Amino acid sequence: SALSSYNSTVDISQLSSENYVGVWQYGGNNNNVSINQSGGNDNLANVSQGFIYTDGAYNFTTPVYNTENNTASITQVGGDNSNRLFQLGDNNDFTLTQAGDGNTVGGRDLEPNVPVGRNGYFEQDGNNNLFTGLQADGATLKHESFQFGDENEIDLLQGASDEALIQQSGNLNTVTNHQGGGGNTSSVV
């Protein structure tokens, strides 16, 4: 496809408050995104790998499922930051680091024309995908977060007063959720 990206790398640093970054890598393999939002509050990062919007209105009517080996890394330091991720295909990795109060995965609804189910999320569709996360100080892994497919893995380390709702559908999937401190909740579905 003319819209496919292969072996591309995007590296973005935003070191203040109220920033937005959106990266879409369409339909290709071996793509890498690294986002660093440190030193500020109210930042939003959006990463989408392996699908194409066919109508320009966030409609996933023609997803590309043959993507693989894509990586995304998001680091957010500060308060009230949020991010969302969507990866389609196999052998994709998502690494998340958040430090500060009120940070979320699957966060704020900043795009009013996008359906709620597609506005804030972490989602990986495919096999052998990995999500590694570190969250501290009252962070939330939102209920819109999913892994679909087989042999997927979630490894999440959270500090005090954190919340996680982890949903996986498929076979031979694993979840490791370490929560330290008080006031934590965790559900695995």
Per-region residue spans from a language model:
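Low-complexity repeat regions of mature extracellularly deployed or surface/particle-associated proteins
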Residues: 1-189
